[in-house]
């Protein structure tokens, strides 16, 4: 049961991250997860590539 809760919470966090915009994204306010630019903050691990 505990593992199920952890998985659900992780999925919710990842889903929220993909719709989160960061001020440091290039271009400005780009969706971090789907961006090919490097974002900072919580979106950084989800950036596809950093230059």
Curated annotation (Swiss-Prot):
Q: What is this protein called?
A: Conotoxin Cal6.33
Instruction: Indicate yes or no for the key word Signal.
Output: yes
- Offer an example of a GO molecular function term for this protein: toxin activity
Does the keyword Oxidoreductase belong to this entry? Answer: no
Q: Regarding domains, what does the record say?
A: The cysteine framework is VI/VII (C-C-CC-C-C).
Q: Family membership, please give it.
A: Belongs to the conotoxin O1 superfamily.
Q: Which UniProt keywords apply?
A: Disulfide bond, Knottin, Neurotoxin, Secreted, Signal, Toxin
Which cysteines in this chain are paired by disulphide bridges? 25-39, 32-43, 38-50
- Please tell me in which tissues this protein is expressed: Expressed by the venom duct.
Q: What is the lineage of its organism?
A: Eukaryota, Metazoa, Spiralia, Lophotrochozoa, Mollusca
Signal peptide interval: 1-22
Cellular component GO terms held in the UniProt record = extracellular region
Give the location in the cell: Secreted
Q: What does this protein do?
A: Probable neurotoxin.
């Amino acid at each position: 049961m505990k593992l199920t809760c952890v998985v659900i919470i992780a999925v919710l966090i990842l889903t929220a991250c993909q719709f989160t915009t960061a001020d440091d994204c290039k271009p400005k306010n780009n969706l971090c997860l789907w961006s090919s630019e490097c974002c900072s903050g919580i979106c950084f691990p989800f950036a596809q590539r950093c230059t």
